[in-house]
Amino acid sequence: MTFPKENINNYASSSFNYKYLIEEFLQWSSSCNRISYPTKYFDFLLVIIMTFVFLCLVYLLIWIEVLLNSSRPDPKHRVYYPRTNFWQRTD
């Protein structure tokens, strides 16, 4: 929150000189508002890259979970059919 310059004296106290600190803060905050175009572009790319990495990690975790939870059926429940040349489940 920035204070208007005409209201600086309203926030000043008699015990300490806050006017100087408020003026310094106003000067610093006004200089921070000037962000260059490459900085904005870099921030945008950073957000895109972080989103992509996050989605890849989520996909990887889901894929690992699917692989770990997919178990083959017991050999008792599988029968080999010679004419089709592959195993089929009976249950």
UniProtKB/Swiss-Prot annotation:
GO terms for biological process: regulation of potassium ion transport. Expressed in the nervous system. InterPro entries: MPS4. GO terms for molecular function: potassium channel regulator activity. Interacts with kvs-1 in the nerve cells. This is MinK-related peptide, potassium channel accessory subunit protein 4. It comes from Caenorhabditis elegans.
